[in-house]
Structures are given as C-alpha cells and as structure tokens.
Amino acid sequence: MIRLEVLNENIDLSDFISQSLNGTIFQNPRFLNYHPENRFPQEQFQIQNFQFFKKNKLVAFLPGRVVTLESGEKVYKSPFASSYGGYVFYKKIKFSEIEEVISLTIAHLKVLGVSEMHLTPGLTCYGHEQGEKENFVEYNLMKEGADVETVELCMVHKVSNEELTQRVDSKIRTELKHCIKYNISGEVEQGVSKSAYDLLESSQANFGKTPTHSFEDLQRICELFPDKIFTFKSYHDGNLIGGIIGFKIQEKVLNTFYIFDAPEHREYKPNHYNYHQVLTWAQNNGIEYVDFGPATFGYTPHYPLIFFKEKFDALPFLKKRYIKKL
C-alpha cells in the first residue's frame, strides 16, 4: 500500500534524486528555488509536490504546480518552469507500484478540482540501464486515458572509450583540422561568466530570441549547484568566438542547454570545436550520455540541426508531453 503526501514548498531532495532511477536536477525542488519569490505567486501557481511512501520508504516523487488560468480552470503541470518533470522513482520500482502511484496522483488532483494533468518526463536514457521502465509509466498513463500531446526529437550522444575521431563524420574531422589550422583554443569553465553570457545573449538576438535564463538566474543556479554548470569555450586570437553551457543533470548525463557563437567568426568553426570539446570532456569525466537537446519544433524537423548532430554520432530519443483530462 502506497500513500501520497503533499509538499507545498520546494525542499531539497538531492539525496533521493541522486540515488534514484531517473531523477535529474530539473526535478529537484531545490533547483526551482532559483526563481525569485514574486515570479510565480502562490495564489496562481500553487506548489504541489507529491511524495509517495511505501512502508515509510520514499519510492517516488512528482514535482509540479497547480496553475489557475484566467478562466478559473486549474491545470497541474510537471514540470513547471523547468525542462523536465514527471515521476522520479527509486531504482527498484515495480510495475504495480508505478500503477498505484499514477492512480493516487489522478485521484488527488480530482479532489483539488484540477481539470488537466500535463507531464513531460525525462528521456529514457536518463534511466540508464533501466531506462525501459519509462514504458511502465507510459503504459499506465495511457491506460488511464492520457494522450501524447507533443513530441520533440532529442539527439543524444552515447559516450564510449572509442576514439572520437573514429565516431564522428568525415566532414567533422575535416572541420576540426580547420580549427587546428586557425589555432582555435578551448577552455572549460565551471559556472557561467559575464562574457560568455553576453555572447549567448547576442547570439540568440540574431534569431529574435532571448535566453531562457537571465544572467542572474544562471548565477543563482550555480550557487545552488556549484559543481553542475559548465561553460565550454572556444577562442581565436584571444577572442571568445563560441560556447556551450552544459548542465550536469545527473552524475552521468550532461545536457548542452545553450549552444552559441559569434556569427562574424563562424569561418573558424567554433561550434564544431565546442561539440568535440564537450565530448572529449565527457569521456574524461565519467559521463555516459551527452544530451544535445531538441532538433525539432514539435512535428516540424529542423533538418540542418538533425544532420549536424548526427555527424557527431548522436542518436534519437523522444521527449513526450502527456495530457490527461480529469
């Protein structure tokens, strides 16, 4: 028999998440504390984090919020203001336990007057050798009447001991030689410097976009998780020409959250250099998967992005968003 307990605050569950089957920093309530208190008022965005216990042992956790829309309708969202949400399970979770956890969630949300539940779990590779257990979740959600609303195609490189130059496309090898010719140098920095953020901001502005996080947001995340955020930089003649900001979301998974460069220096191939720099660092630091992020806009493929990431021997994983009407 499993029981559900509600947490109306973002407490630190780092120990449980770090030892779980599939948890990431994105699902850790502590991570969500980087948001300023007034950004999401509790009256409209009520914290509803669910803990599930079996014989006083924490077996599952679901982070989320009940969002009250202008119409008065209530929607439960997991994640809320984060990249991934969904359930975090202890490593020995069984099918019947997942079934009960989902059933308890739905019953509780109905009591709260919630009309819809939105869940976006992590990729199956976040469960490593037991990632297939995510199929238990998908099956039970669909058994309860949930639908897949959107799907994103994420490209992920599985790290091995094989020489990187043998795994990447021949054109990438040529471009990397180009980087050597122009004396491109690299640096791996813990945290995010102002110069790196300024280049990120200007790079995204070229596409009419702004970064998801402000510089202050990233500094706060670095304070909360000082050993989880890295910037991979490339330089030409001492000038910063490109970078990748990576989140170490698990001990063995690196998520390349931001990829950016200076358009006027693209002839030096900073992105090629930085992708290779990230994969080399991953090999040397016990990383098993490098998540290069989405390469689609829902069901619209971003072909150049897919082709580019394929050249770095990236494989496809699906990021699914489920909706269950209550």
Ranges and model annotations:
Residues E99-L104, R220, L224, K228-L326:
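Aromatic (often tryptophan-rich) hydrophobic motifs at membrane interfaces
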Residues F80-Y84, T150, F317:
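Short, solvent-exposed loop/turn segments at the edges of secondary structure
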Residues I2-G72, L123-E149, C154-H265:
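A conserved beta-strand-loop-helix scaffold within acyl/acetyltransferase catalytic domains
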Residues V67-G86:
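Conserved acyl-donor/pantetheine-binding loop and adjacent beta-alpha core of acyl/acetyltransferases
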Residues L119-E132, F292-Y303:
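Conserved beta-strand-loop-alpha-helix junction that forms the acyl-donor binding cleft
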Residues S115-M117, E288:
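Short acidic/polar active-site loop segments enriched in Thr and Asp
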Residues Y84-K94:
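The substrate-binding groove and active-site-proximal loops of carbohydrate-active enzymes
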